[in-house]
């Protein structure tokens, strides 16, 4: 991550996992299914594992004989995942930077990444590294968020935070900045992949309440660091965001549509 506004530190990992899992779990199920339905493999490398939301689903969907190595650049996220899932057998944990992976060439049959490539400053290097560590014919499977306009709950909270900061929060540029299908195709193809397939997955996610969702987005992302740096307490922002979300999507539960772009490709 380039700077601390893209870092998941302090209480962010816990809030991210507690409040935002409902946003990520359906997409994790989809991605794990794609990995599991591919040709049989003996090893999977997960990049940007975060708090282990995809990791759990990969372990559940793949035979126990399949080796799973879960990595993340941010130590607090990796430590949280290890604490939460440390008792789950068949998972290896390792800190790793996606642009300089500490693994031999051709050592994995699949590389999976949920909502991580958007945050990598040198995306070409990350895809090149993914290609390097894949065996011949290995699978690359990842998702990224669709544009912000297709994820209206996030847009509502972004606008609320903007009203407090007096400007757009910088954090939101990264998660929703890699949705262009042509750019994705070119990035993947130019770094050695073939058989590229790109699709859109839209899922309705359900949060217990609008306040629950607002709390997750405000406190479970580096946007909270921007508020802190601006001397703004999170509670008034959460209250305002919850009210806006309830008006737009209802309350108890709060149902919102989320959209992601999913890419699969093969190493030659």
Where are the model-predicted features located?
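A short acidic, Gly/Pro-enriched loop at the edge of an enzyme's catalytic core
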Residues: 99-111
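A short SAM/SAH-binding and catalytic strip from SAM-dependent methyltransferases
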Residues: 109-123, 146
